[in-house]
Amino acid sequence: MRSAAALDQTFRALADQTRRSMIHALAGGEARSAGELGAQFHSAQPTISRHLKVLENARLIERQVEGRIHRFRLRRSSLKDAGDWIRRHQAFWTGAVDQLEQLLKEQEP
């Protein structure tokens, strides 16, 4: 399990629609170059590079350097940790709402 700071960084990275779309584009498992991603998102190279750096710093993607080409691949383990955190808290809130609903039913005249 990742630290709280690492999860914070993950959720900050995922807060941006373009970065979530990049994660989706990489979800197929194939490594993609920054240029390929830039063409897909119709963004300038510096913008794409900044988004990729945020994702890389959050450990959501990893970089593979092949000469001058930098390819990026999704790191599924980081997404799994974030998903596990969400599921744990979802279970808590679902249980709390169910308990509240039961209490309210018991209080009805």
Q: Predicted regions span which residues?
A:
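Amphipathic alpha-helical dimerization/coiled-coil segments
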Residues: 1-6, 27-28, 80-109
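N-terminal helix-turn-helix DNA-binding core of bacterial DNA-binding proteins
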Residues: 2-46, 69-80, 84
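A cross-family signal for key residues in well-ordered alpha-helices
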Residues: 24, 56, 62, 94, ...
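Alpha-helical residues within the helix-turn-helix
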Residues: 38-39, 50, 56-57
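Beta-hairpin "wing" of winged helix-turn-helix
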Residues: 57-67, 73
